[in-house]
Amino acid sequence: MRLLMSQEIMFKYIFPDLAAIQKESFKSFLLEGLSEVLDSFPIIVDPTGKLELQFFGKDYKLKFPRYSVRKAKSRDKTYSAQIYIPAKLTRRDIEVIKENISTSKDLSYFFNSQDINKKYRKRPVFIGDLPLMTNRGTFVISGTERIIINQIVRSPGVYYKKELDKNNKQIYSCSIISNRGSWLKFEIDSKAQIWAKIDKNHKVSAYIFLRSIGLNNEDIRKRLTKYNYLINSSLTYYKKEFSKDVNNVDIEKITEEEALVIVYSKLRPNEPATLAVAKQMLYTRFFDPKRYDLGAVGRHKINQKLNLKVPTHFRVLSPEDILVSLDYLLNIKEQNIGTFDDIDHLGNRRVRSVGELLQNQVRIGLNRLERIIRERMIICDLDSLSLSNLVNPKPLMASVREFFSSSQLSQFMDQTNPLSELTHKRRISALGPGGLNKDRAGFAVRDLHPSHYGRICPIETPEGPNAGLIGSLSIYAKVNRYGFIETPCYKVTDGQVLKKDKLYYITADQEDYLRIAPADISLDVNDFIQDKIIAVRYKQEFITATISQVDYMAVSPIQFISAATSLIPFLEHDDANRALMGSNMQRQAVPLLFPEKSIVGTGLEAKIAKDSGMTIISRTNGTVSYVSGTKIGIQNKEGYTIHYRLKKYYRSNQDTCINQRPIVWPGENIRIGQTIADGASTDGGEIALGRNIIVAYMPWEGYNYEDAFLISERLVYEDLYTSIHIERYELECRQTKLGSEEITRDIPNVSEASIGLLDKNGIISIGSWVDAGDILVGKVTPKGESDQLPEGKLLRAIFGEKARDVRDTSLRLPNATKGRVVNVKIFKRQKGDELPPGTNEIIRVYVAQKRKIQVGDKMAGRHGNKGIISRILSLQDMPFLPDGTPVDIILNPLGVPSRMNVGQLFECLLGLAGEYSSKRFKIIPFDEMYGSEASRALVYNKLKQASSMNDKSWLFNALHPGKVMLVDGRTGEFFDNPVTVGKAYILKLVHLVDDKIHARSTGPYSLVTQQPLGGRAQHGGQRLGEMEVWALEAFGAAYTLQELLTVKSDDMQGRNDALNAIVKGKPIPKPGTPESFKVLMRELQSLALDIAVHKLELLDNGNKASIEIDLMSDEQVSAI
């Protein structure tokens, strides 16, 4: 049973589709963005003017994808469609031929004209592949699912700013920022001079710049209210800089041509200034649609700020824009009329989603294509040119491939669980091309801003260098067509909240001038606000207002938080830092073998599970006609059966297991939108990341020191926290110089037992249990004469036997792994599979591991309470409740007060009440609208009810509510003090000890330094760093230190000798010279420094002789 704490707040229709930001953006790209960028491709004419190429971008077509999503994943291909665009190649001199045909009766002309018309008619041409989005909002690139995350950047438009210069004097500036092209900035410095800056570097007097773009004195005088101020400020500069070079003395008499030359000389100081070149340069900088683009957003923002009415399709600067923006700057400086802009305000920052990012990348590819076409028109013979050899698809394909493969915004999708997948799609990053750099980003841009309310979550962000630069969309937020984030509100009229009316989506700059009431104010039955005076948000401040002044009301108390944060019950009782950790750790929860929905939730679990795409949703009303483990059939009213295929034991990007299970039965009536199959980490259509287990907050023999967890063996034996992990192992069968490699069961020098699990082809059978070192695929590689061992050569010489000249290169299971083979995929060139060059066959083996919870695994609650398992205690030793129920996990009580995440206590106590009263609770955070201390009152009330229902008085003791007298399982006696016990929702995180634990005896070494490699993946050693050396020095452990720095590290001769000595049981010899010391010597010698050690010897005649010691020789060094 679920108990909703909120009545009308959680209306279903309020919630947008949480993955819609990706899908809608790509949809608009296909419908508008792609045709717009293709249509902007210019008509290309060759230098002679005889040949013309034209694209008809609006009529583009996409060919049906070659591979389905499922096939693209299994074959390591990209799920994409080919773009065909109608193009026409025209010969201007073809009219001459047509005239000849009309005057001549020779038939040869007629046939020639037919060929020419065929060659130069309009026809579709292939320009590249476009990766397509799957119905879950992802892309399949080279077989892996990827996400394009949303980027938040400064919006194009006009911005006014007041700042301090180097001398701490105020300067006023106005920046006109474009979507594509040069930036223009007007600046009034501390000396009251007005400058125009182009691209931040080159500056010139503002008046001269205005004259250079074609404005005369009359135009400037009409539009500028402070015309004289502009003239006076320009005069000083003009006299100082240009009075010698320019004939006129009066600045107002300067001509447009002279102004153009001045501006050009400032922008290109080393080039001769000519009028035509200067005019062309200024035109291309600000007025050429090909080179300069404000975008629809920039035009909208300029019109809004400067109160202009320029059409949205006019996307270059106009002289009026420049004049009005300068006039606004002069007014703000002189008369304080106008407002400055806050760059961190969300009204001035916009989101670039996948569609726009892809559009920009296609534009880059088309620009490269245009350059190649122009070059070919110049180089090639006109008669030999045709559409097929003129239009090359490679530039566009390379540009798109580069974006998806290596862009900072294209990321390997986080598929750990449904929540991590959904959050990844809703992520917003300020990094990436055209964005910020995490090393240079200041505190202001990372900080919270009042305009973030309801738009960007203030809680969910990474810890570390990316804090504040990567965020997540709030749960109700939408992105409008201009890229600005909107949040919904209810309209309020005369104190009545119009909840039955439509929702109003409001942008951040609109919100500044509205009085918006919070969602947790009390309303009567007719939705009238009960209080006479309430706190509202207005102009980024909290003020009080009467109910008649209120314009809008927020829709929900959780409006400002993200999807992950909204899953934390009693969030308002947690410190923000711990809530941040809780949000991030929920995304790391590994899908369990037996998922269980939480007793205490927030009501959003079903919505998040549905929108994540991990469950299967019915697309029609009907009746279930067929159910199996792999397929569900639903018959609709028309009698047609729609089949839904379930994913069984698929491997995710993070090696977790994706397995879908049906939750309907034959004959059941199904409604459209109903969940018919659960996926990973879902239970009954709700997200289920962990398990409900009994927790006790108490110390136990020091085993929960520093946040460690003590768990019961019940969690192991009953598989409560068992998860399945699927690893993929791949083997390529290549063509070598000595012949082709062979997949076979006949492997030299291998026992029959080792190949017992292989089939007749040498491939492991599905269902086999494999341990570390077992052969998965048998393979032999031809070897040359030099690869033969001396014994082999001798045998061949004696017996003349042509033995198999092959060596064993089989695929074996790596160390410390074991599991069951769940799938084998074989790709052969002979069967028509596309394989890399030189590869004849690829075999992939999928091995599933069942991992039980063990010491060293990481667990966490939803409130940032994380820890490592320190010990697994037997069931009889665990403390138990008065009714005999043993505790499942013991947490450290010292982890609560200083962390200030008290929400975990409310959750576990309410969970205990729910367990004993067979109820589940959905708690909306911020419940103070129901009264003071509402959370505590609810928890105590439910505990009391559970106590009376079950006749268990120990569940609620008025003397110490929420605490229980526990019995020590070892002694059978009560502990001295009552202990807080409850039922909490605990997650097992993906940081598993099996993936972390590592040891090395011998292994690979670095080629140059001969020191062991580092890291688990390279089977490396532990670094003995500077501080460890200091510690050994401090203890005087000289021989230990010598051994660690030589024999155990990079003394090549010494380590071989030491190994032989250990094997033969002899004393370990003295160490020699480390290889890294030899490298140092060589580096010094390369700098022409002769570093040498000399040994002084006393000769028989009494003289001293200096003998140089070769430091590269171990024998000479050891003899010193």
UniProtKB/Swiss-Prot annotation:
Example GO biological process: DNA-templated transcription
Keyword Metal-binding recorded: no
The EC number(s) this enzyme carries: 2.7.7.6
GO molecular function terms noted in the UniProt entry: DNA binding; DNA-directed RNA polymerase activity; ribonucleoside binding
Catalysis performed (reactions): RNA(n) + a ribonucleoside 5'-triphosphate = RNA(n+1) + diphosphate
Keyword Plastid: yes
Main location: plastid
Highest taxon of source: Eukaryota
Family label: Belongs to the RNA polymerase beta chain family.
Protein name stated in the entry: DNA-directed RNA polymerase subunit beta
Source species of the chain: Gracilaria tenuistipitata var. liui
